[in-house]
Amino acid sequence: MAATSPLRDCQAWKDARLPLSTTSNEACKLFDATLTQYVKWTNDKSLGGIEGCLSKLKAADPTFAMGHAISTGLVLIGTGSSVKLDKELDLAVKTMMEVSRTQPLTRREQLHVSAVETFAKGNFPKACELWEQILQDHPTDMLALKFSHDAYFYLGYQEQMRDSVARIYPFWTPDIPLSSYVKGIYSFGLMETNFYDQAEKLAKEALSINPTDAWSVHTVAHIHEMKAEIKDGLEFMQHSETLWKDSDMLACHNYWHWALYLIEKGEYEAALTIYDTHILPSLQANGAMLDVVDSCSMLYRLQMEGVSVGQRWQDVLPVTRKHSRDHTLLFNDAHFLMASLGAHDPQTTQELLTTLRDASESPGENCQHLLARDVGLPLCQALVEAEDGNPDRVLELLLPIRYRIVQLGGSNAQRDVFNQLLIHAALNCTSSVHKNVARSLLMERDALKPNSPLTERLIRKAATVHLLQ
């Protein structure tokens, strides 16, 4: 899929009131090419992919500060490495700062550089403040919009994720490159804050302009998931598959949503076929964090449903084990832990828990390490207790923090794996103190998401163990 608008040179960026401090037209165009692929979730072969564009960009102008900001920012926003452990990434941040100090930059560019440096330190809220400062004066700065959107997602700041786009949406007129994608970005924030009708309208508008917009497809997939519209969801994914399957950075995740509908229906073999055909190959090909959490979450959900996943955890473990000490995102950590527990690797499990505990004891300004003690570690311990067959302990750990788990980020659909963990623990508990917890949780789930086959199965299970009396 080639870029639909011509790539912008120095003058075009000036005309857009987003001037870039470089005299290289080639660098400006490669910056645009990189940004376009990031927004579209697609490595465009005709442009050389994101990696190809970034290496050519650095060659075109090694001192281009915004080139460094987008390059380093994309690695950081991928959450697959940390400056503490990845010396190359640490050097990239330092180089970006040095380059920015050697030349006069616009205030907007200075804020971009500062935001990336702040994000690298793990202070996501402060980084978002800096990106928001940019958007106040430059509402059509797509890089600030996308970086802040992703960071809000990692923070579980759902209202901010929505409102950040609401504030700038009117400025994105159809003549601006990538404007239709802003509809999709806005629709996701609306969906996560339960404005389903408005979200669907915007996502469908985006798709009418560009049917290959995989992120807007993704919003619609979420809406069907949250409303338990399983038949509609399956039909939508099947009919649109040819349009989004080439968006290589998001296709795996869209297949994950497809598989969730099948798990919801109890069609486990069909779900495993999607896993084996699309999700695992994507994980093994690129090891992106989104593919990692999709793989772990799906296998864990199937296991809770009583499905044998065979040796599949052994395929995931080599990827997750490399990240046991990263502690970039607590949300990621919980999923890495699912893999080491599922693969019965106590050494990796212990390494993750010990190093996370260490990080929580000297968090500095790192928002994830600050949250580890009260939310991240209890959640991780609950996963361990579930594996060890201690359902009452799982409840003791999770019930006090269940309304704080949103702070770990991810979407409502992704975090539902933790809701299911809590319900399964409640169904298996033995303590009289907890005998009515399953009933309460299931009534709540049924009220929020009526007509869910998965909830109906859990209610039947509760009835057989006399927990609904």
UniProtKB/Swiss-Prot annotation:
Modified residues (Phosphoserine): S5
TPR repeats: 108-141, 180-213, 252-285
Keywords associated with the record: Acetylation, Phosphoprotein, Repeat, TPR repeat
N-acetylalanine PTM positions: A2
InterPro entries in UniProt: TPR-like_helical_dom_sf, TTC38
PANTHER family named among the record's database cross-references: TETRATRICOPEPTIDE REPEAT PROTEIN 38 (PTHR16263:SF4)
Family: Belongs to the TTC38 family.
Protein name from the UniProt record: Tetratricopeptide repeat protein 38
Species assigned in the record: Pongo abelii
Gene it is expressed from: TTC38
